UniProtKB/Swiss-Prot annotation:
Membrane topology (Cytoplasmic): 369-525
Annotated localization: Membrane
Protein name: Neuropilin and tolloid-like protein 2
Post-translational modification summary for this protein: N-glycosylated.
Keyword Cytoplasm: no
């Protein structure tokens, strides 16, 4: 009976042990799925005491064994012009392994997970004194699912930076060279460092860009420009891409050669880091990031034919957001219309006013060019004195009548009438011209001879005054006088019908360029 009771108790104890072990194994399996994903806050990673001169921290549950599958990160920051010294207590034990691949303590010289690695520590012997080169130190403790140990306890203190002791008060803060971008797409560019004066000329460049995609989206990265001043020298210049965080285990790609490929991230957070030492400041890059979701695509997204769905606002925007240019293939008509519309709205008035001014100036120029030669010809015609030129080469001659074109009709009519009267008077006086010769004596004889000479010197006369030859440059005057009768003092008074002496003076003036010629004809009978 007693033996049976003892067997029953043993069975219960065995079942209890199996149940506890099963629960422990299940818990370890669940914790193992969270490795590298969740960063445990410092409050859950043991004690951390901070002071103005330093502080101390320890692994979880120290001095008891640390739990499995734990990850704790400690970032130490000193004041400007100071560095950090880190020491460990003698009671120290972390699961030993080759190259500390399992449980380990990682220390980096800087504030980030990609800062230069100082070393990895594990085993039973505590590390020696660790000293930073700047005012930051990044420390990570990690444990796997089995073989836990005692852990560690570390102390840190701030010491003066020996590189600045001789400069007397010059501060040495770490360059705040961090940028954040988000949205459907955007540009990451290294020129932003100089534009915002994040670093001084001659200093090394160590900057990061944190990219956040739209909700439930991933990130696609494509280099638009990339050049390393010292190719294939990754210690001097490189561009690194991290997927999810800046932790070293999340490094996706690192470029330091002559070519940089596109990168497709699996999360919605991307970190871009650029490093260039003092002699590599000419290194540069420009990168396009695009938020995308995996198919099936919704009505608000565009299918890129490369397992990507991008926002409709990125289609035909002049930038290739897809891995292949599907989003910009059929946009020629749309681009032309958009460009014309933009020009019409913003510059239509300016273009119209400018075109009007140019048109007016063109018309004025044409008119000036057309009229200018005519003015020259008219000026030459006015300056050229044909009469004076002809007088130089032709012998002088006289004409009986020289009239202006405007007065020729009236003057010719009067002249024709007077000549007719003259001819009639001549015919009527011819029969009785010798009646009174005995009254005048020798004077009558001279008058007779004068009339005879006048008869023999018959002046040429043309009766076709209707169309005379125009005289352009001669300035002539024609003087008319009424018939007058002269008596000699030797002759007695006679009746009006006995008057036989009549004088008709006619003066013809022909003016040249400088002087005038005058001719007068007196006819007596």
């Amino acid at each position: 009976m007693a033996l049976e009771q003892l067997c029953a108790v043993l069975k219960v104890l065995l079942i209890t042990v199996l149940v506890v072990e099963g629960i422990a194994v299940a818990q370890k399996t669940q914790d193992g799925q969270n490795i590298g994903i969740k960063h445990v806050p410092a409050t859950q990673c043991g004690i951390w005491v901070r002071t103005s001169n330093g502080g101390h921290f320890a692994s979880p549950n120290y001095p008891d064994s640390y739990p499995p599958n734990k990850e704790c990160i400690y970032i130490l920051e000193a004041a400007p012009r100071q560095r950090i010294e880190l020491t460990f207590d003698e009671r120290y034990y972390i699961e030993p392994s080759f190259e500390c691949r399992f449980d380990h303590l990682e220390v980096r010289d800087g504030p980030f997970g990609f800062s230069p690695l100082i070393d990895r520590y594990c085993g039973m012997k505590s590390p020696a004194l660790i000293r930073s080169t700047g005012r930051f130190m990044w420390i990570k403790f990690s444990s796997d699912e089995e073989l836990e140990g005692l852990g560690f306890r570390a102390k840190y203190s701030f010491i003066p930076d020996p590189d600045f002791t001789y400069l007397g008060g010059i501060l040495n803060p770490i360059p705040d060279c961090q940028f954040e971008l988000s949205g459907a797409d955007g540009i990451v560019r290294s020129s932003q460092v100089e534009q915002e004066e994040k670093t001084k000329p001659g200093q090394a460049v160590d900057c990061i860009w944190t990219i956040k995609a739209t909700p439930k989206a991933k990130i696609y990265l494509r280099f638009l420009d990339y050049q390393m001043e010292h190719s294939n020298e990754c210690k001097r210049n490189f561009v690194a891409v991290y997927d999810g965080s800046s932790a070293i285990e999340n490094l996706k790609a690192k470029f330091c050669s002559t070519v940089a490929n596109d990168v497709m991230l699996k999360t919605g957070v991307g970190v871009i880091r650029m490093w260039a030492d003092e002699g590599s400041r000419l290194s540069r890059f420009r990168m396009l990031f695009t938020s995308f979701v995996e198919p099936p695509c919704t009505s608000s997204t565009f299918f890129c034919h490369s397992n990507m769905c991008i926002n409709n606002s990125l289609v035909c925007n002049g930038v290739q957001n897809c891995a292949y240019p599907w989003d910009e293939n059929h946009c020629k008509e749309k681009k032309k219309a958009g460009l014309f519309e933009q020009i019409t709205k913003t510059h239509g008035t300016i273009i119209g006013v400018t075109s009007g001014i140019v048109l007016v100036l063109l018309i004025i120029s044409i008119l000036v060019q057309v009229k200018q030669p005519r003015k020259k010809v008219m000026a030459c015609k006015t300056a050229f004195n044909k009469t004076g030129f002809q007088e130089v080469f032709d012998p002088p001659h006289y004409e009986l009548f020289s009239l202006r074109e405007k007065e020729i009709s009236a003057d010719l009519a009067d002249l024709s009438e007077e000549l007719d009267n003259y001819q009639k008077l001549r015919r009527s006086s011819t029969a009785s011209r010798c009646i009174h010769d005995h009254h005048c004596g020798s004077q009558a004889s001279s008058v007779k001879q004068s009339r005879t000479n006048l008869s023999s010197m018959e002046l040429p006369f043309r009766n076709d005054f209707a169309q005379p030859q125009p005289m352009k440059t001669f300035n002539s005057t024609f003087k008319k006088s009424s018939y007058t009768f002269k008596q000699t003092h030797d002759c007695p008074e006679q009746a009006l019908e006995d008057r036989v002496m009549e004088e008709i003076p006619c003066e013809i003036y022909v003016r040249g360029r400088d002087d005038s010629a005058q001719a007068s004809i007196s006819i007596d009978f």
